[in-house]
A protein has these predicted regions:
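Acidic/His-rich structured neighborhood in mature extracellular/periplasmic domains
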Residues: 40-155
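Detector for methionine-enriched segments
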Residues: 1-4, 28, 73, 144
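Residue-level detector of alpha-helical secondary structure
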Residues: 12, 31-34, 66-70
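Sequence/structural signature of beta-propeller domains
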Residues: 25-40, 45-46
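Bacterial Sec-dependent N-terminal signal peptides
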Residues: 1-20
Length: 155
């Protein structure tokens, strides 16, 4: 339960920077609540040894997939309260992969900073950093490329 509350908080944080209307922000919360009874399982995307593909598994989530699914649902049009599967998959791919293009394992956005920047660049997140803090820090992210032996998809 503590994990799901933390995940809900994460979704709310994403909702505050979502470039959508208040109605969409409410959709983030409502979508997140729907995941309360869904088990937390680590590495839910590491299920294939072959070519990178769009994995959708709403029966179990990790920290990242929880937020990705919640945001993809909020960005997708609904009909009779249901999200169209095709729209959901299209939005999920835009969220999860650099510029929405699946081009192998490295095209997946593994670092949250890259994930946020991709969202800002593609218009479904808004950078509110300067509105809340005058302090920013640029970081260089290279752990995965510096340690490829730790990732079977990179070794």
């Amino acid at each position: 339960m503590k994990t799901m509350i933390t995940l809900l908080f994460s979704a709310l944080c994403v909702a505050t920077v979502s470039a959508q209307t208040d109605e969409k922000d409410n959709a983030m919360l409502n979508n997140g609540i729907n995941f309360l009874d869904i088990p937390y399982v680590a590495h839910t995307l590491e299920v294939t040894d072959g070519e990178e593909e769009l994995i959708i598994n709403c029966d179990e989530v990790d920290c990242t997939t929880f937020v990705e699914y919640t945001l993809a649902m909020a960005l997708s049009p609904t009909e009779d309260g249901q999200v169209a599967e095709g729209d959901f998959a299209t939005n999920l791919q835009k969220i999860r992969y650099r510029d929405g293009k699946i081009n192998g394992y490295p095209s997946r956005l593994h670092y949250i900073a890259d994930w946020v920047n991709n969202g800002i660049r593609n218009g479904f997140l808004e950078d509110v950093t300067t509105a809340y803090s005058p302090y920013t820090q640029k970081v260089s992210l290279s752990y995965m490329s510096s340690h490829p032996e730790l990732y079977k998809q990179l070794s």
